[in-house]
Amino acid sequence: MAWQSSSKVPDGEFTAVVYRLIRDSRYSEAVQLLSAELQRSSRSRAGLSLLAYCYYRLQEFELAAECYEQLSQMHPELEQYRLYQAQALYKACLYPEATRVTFLLDNPAYQTRVLRLQAAIKYSEGDLPGARSLVEQLLSGEAGEDSGGENDPDGLVNMGCLLYKEGHYEAACSKFLAALQASGYQPDLSYNLALAYYSSRQYAPALKHIADIIERGIRQHPELGVGMTTEGIDVRSVGNTVVLHQTALIEAFNLKAAIEYQLRNFEVAQETLTDMPPRAEEELDPVTLHNQALMNMDAKPTEGFEKLQFLLQQNPFPPETFGNLLLLYCKYEYFDLAADVLAENAHLTYKFLTPYLYDFLDAMITCQTAPEEAFIKLDGLAGMLTEQLRRLTKQVQEARHNRDDEIIKKAMNEYDETLEKYIPVLMAQAKIYWNLENYPMVEKIFRKSVEFCNDHDVWKLNVAHVLFMQENKYKEAIGFYEPIVKKNYDNILSVSAIVLANLCVSYIMTSQNEEAEELMRKIEKEEEQLSYGDPDKKIYHLCIVNLVIGTLYCAKGNYDFGISRVIKSLEPYHKKLGTDTWYYAKRCFLSLLENMSKHMIVLCDGVVQECVQFLEYCELYGRNIPAVLEQPLEEERIHTGKNTVTYESRLLKALIYEVIGWNM
């Protein structure tokens, strides 16, 4: 039963009813009763105190702080209300206000708690020297007997947090592990340890601690509905309860998703996010919202941009939000938007962007208007990074000579991080010449970087592409495509369809037809096996391979064979016709129509009839298939009636009739 107002509570039972609601965690109902009562008796200390407590439990920290402020004004002799006000302001991320209130507390009994709170505020503000000074004061025992020592669990956690923020992840791991052993299992502490392992790239122990948090959370709180959403079960939101917060389940699932994303297990990362306890979208925390945006960007880019833009207006927001939004704007070529966001948020630039990331974004934005200038900027950045890579290579060699495993590990991690910065710079340089179709220059850029990148999959893939595009280097392209395919041969559908298609074409162009046929049989076999488990699933790999081969023959002028191959590749239409496959098919038809209209080729009636019949099938099956995937933030949308395969296939059919002079 929900209590709407205090008038409905029987006489003499108001206090009992309120305490019963609080006992049952029905804080919203308790707030309704207490608010109504306080309208009649605004100076009730008990009422205000209970209302503040309920607001705090509901995570309405600003409202809780207002109540505690009133209480401290009404009862200045009771300093605990000022302490509670400061704690609520800290939880509301109002750090300057919280700091001001802590300075008003001078009761020695609260000295330790005040110092801890001040240290937490400094830490959250990013003032690490200030936070460390206060933590060391606590550890020294200056704040009193209850301030703990160096081996006290709280002290270990505080030092671990500081070490983590300072980038000393392994030292932080040691502190968190010691705290865990001293205090016994605690979900939040186990999460801290997992996070420190993650940041030091030790994913296996991080996942072990995450699994422990999730397993205990499921066992102790089955009511939180872990995994229900992924299984398609319609469940109610569990809300942002104190119990949910205490389990650290949300944090654990977010960290697991981040690890899977880093390991390029994108589907597992997406499932991990849906495995977490169900909450309504308005209840989601900033980290979950950020991760949802990032991990579903390919499928829902518009929604992803909206979420990241929304987060940028919040205080606080995950520190990665600003950089990720700018990088995604550049990825989707919204350079003007990226420039606007940088200009409007200069204060965030210095706080959230490293000098490397700022310089990289600046060069990417410059690419739009001054590609030559952008190339020079990127070249400067690449030069700086190659110097770092050479220095680290030398460090690793010296450490190996001295058999110093610790230095080897540290230098190797730093080398990997620097290489991950270098690759995007290199690719951005190459893209400038790629857009100009100057493929020899792209190849030259890649060859200059072979010293560092020859084992990097992204580099190898792009070298293969640029060799393939030069048309006289198919044999060299095979040398780069083949290892990528063979590495994933047992799960060949995990390889991009265009990579498989380009490898098949390269085989054909170098008279290795048997290898091409064997690869296509392997793809066909895997597609068949996959369709047994999910008959309705659309799989495009073999279709795209055949389309690219058909396109090759069309490009060589053999339209009879090429168009026939394109048509057959899309059968059956209900499983093979999609936006991507239609893109390849219509290019061949447009090329055919162009050459027919110039009277450069003549098709026999049988092939023309085959083309018309194919387009009629596309018209039938393409009603709900977009002809073009529009850019997520495009202001001028294509008319929905025109952006379908059905519309475009009708248009192509009409053009065929017009070119050959048939009457419709």
Curated annotation (Swiss-Prot):
Which InterPro entries does the record match to this protein? TPR-like_helical_dom_sf (IPR011990), TPR_rpt (IPR019734), TT30 (IPR039941)
Q: Which Gene3D superfamilies match?
A: Tetratricopeptide repeat domain
* GO MF entries: intraciliary transport particle B binding
User: What compartments host this protein?
Assistant: Cell projection, Cilium
The UniProt entry lists the main location of this chain as other
TPR repeat boundaries on the chain = 11-44, 45-78, 153-186, 188-220, 393-423, 424-456, 458-491, 543-576
Using the chain's own numbering, where are the disulfide bonds?
none
- The membrane-spanning stretches of this chain are none
Q: Which family does it belong to?
A: Belongs to the TTC30/dfy-1/fleer family.
Outline what the protein does: Required for polyglutamylation of axonemal tubulin. Plays a role in anterograde intraflagellar transport (IFT), the process by which cilia precursors are transported from the base of the cilium to the site of their incorporation at the tip.
Could you tell me what this protein is called?
Intraflagellar transport protein 70A1
Q: Which gene encodes it?
A: Ift70a1
